[in-house]
């Protein structure tokens, strides 16, 4: 499973002119299920995201996670957006191939599982809309952008 995290001051997802998900300070999580992924990869990816220390402490060092933005338990938001294009392979030319992405039904199942687990473990979760044409608006904080990959064999 792959994800790209963007530390944001705020972010929102718009579908057909309507905002479907919105957060303040937190993480925009673009996520992609790959062929061979299962719940184990989703669990490992989510655990890493929730514990990743990419928010600044009082000294300006990246020592805080989305679960503890201020050292006193303030939690940031997660805006989770499905993005199968993270599985793009351009090694064979200039047109991306997406054969490494999970099949649409399996991708939706794993995305839904990932979101359900996030909702169970974190109080501030919003989402995009699976397989929709989305406009993602964000104010990148830093900028800080982190790619993550949990191997399907993991």
Swiss-Prot record:
It is an enzyme of class 3 (hydrolase). The keyword Transmembrane does not apply. InterPro entries: Daa-tRNA_deacyls_DTD, DTD-like_sf. Keywords: Cytoplasm, Hydrolase, RNA-binding, tRNA-binding. Pfam families: Tyr_Deacylase (PF02580). Transmembrane segments: none annotated. A motif (Gly-cisPro motif, important for rejection of L-amino acids) lies at residues 142-143. It catalyses: glycyl-tRNA(Ala) + H2O = tRNA(Ala) + glycine + H(+); a D-aminoacyl-tRNA + H2O = a tRNA + a D-alpha-amino acid + H(+). GO terms for cellular component: cytoplasm. It is found in: Cytoplasm. GO terms for molecular function: D-tyrosyl-tRNA(Tyr) deacylase activity; Gly-tRNA(Ala) deacylase activity; Ser(Gly)-tRNA(Ala) hydrolase activity; tRNA binding. It comes from the Bacteria. Its main location: cytoplasm. Its EC number is 3.1.1.96. An aminoacyl-tRNA editing enzyme that deacylates mischarged D-aminoacyl-tRNAs. Also deacylates mischarged glycyl-tRNA(Ala), protecting cells against glycine mischarging by AlaRS. Acts via tRNA-based rather than protein-based catalysis; rejects L-amino acids rather than detecting D-amino acids in the active site. By recycling D-aminoacyl-tRNA to D-amino acids and free tRNA molecules, this enzyme counteracts the toxicity associated with the formation of D-aminoacyl-tRNA entities in vivo and helps enforce protein L-homochirality. Belongs to the DTD family. NCBIfam families: D-aminoacyl-tRNA deacylase. Homodimer. A Gly-cisPro motif from one monomer fits into the active site of the other monomer to allow specific chiral rejection of L-amino acids. This is D-aminoacyl-tRNA deacylase.
């Amino acid at each position: 499973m792959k994800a790209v995290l963007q530390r944001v001051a705020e972010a929102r997802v718009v579908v057909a002119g309507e905002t479907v998900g919105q957060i303040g300070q937190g993480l925009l999580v673009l996520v992609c299920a790959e062929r061979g992924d299962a719940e184990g990869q989703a669990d490992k990816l989510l655990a890493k995201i929730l514990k990743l220390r990419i928010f600044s402490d009082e000294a300006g060092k990246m020592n805080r996670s989305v679960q503890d933005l201020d050292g006193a338990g303030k939690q940031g938001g997660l805006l989770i957006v499905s993005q199968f294009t993270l599985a793009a392979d351009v090694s064979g030319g200039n047109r991306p191939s997406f054969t490494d992405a999970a099949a649409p039904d399996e991708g939706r199942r794993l995305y839904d599982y990932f979101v359900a687990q996030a909702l169970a473990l974190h109080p501030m979760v919003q989402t995009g809309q699976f397989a929709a044409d989305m406009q993602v608006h964000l104010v990148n904080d830093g900028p800080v952008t982190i790619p993550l990959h949990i191997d399907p064999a993991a």
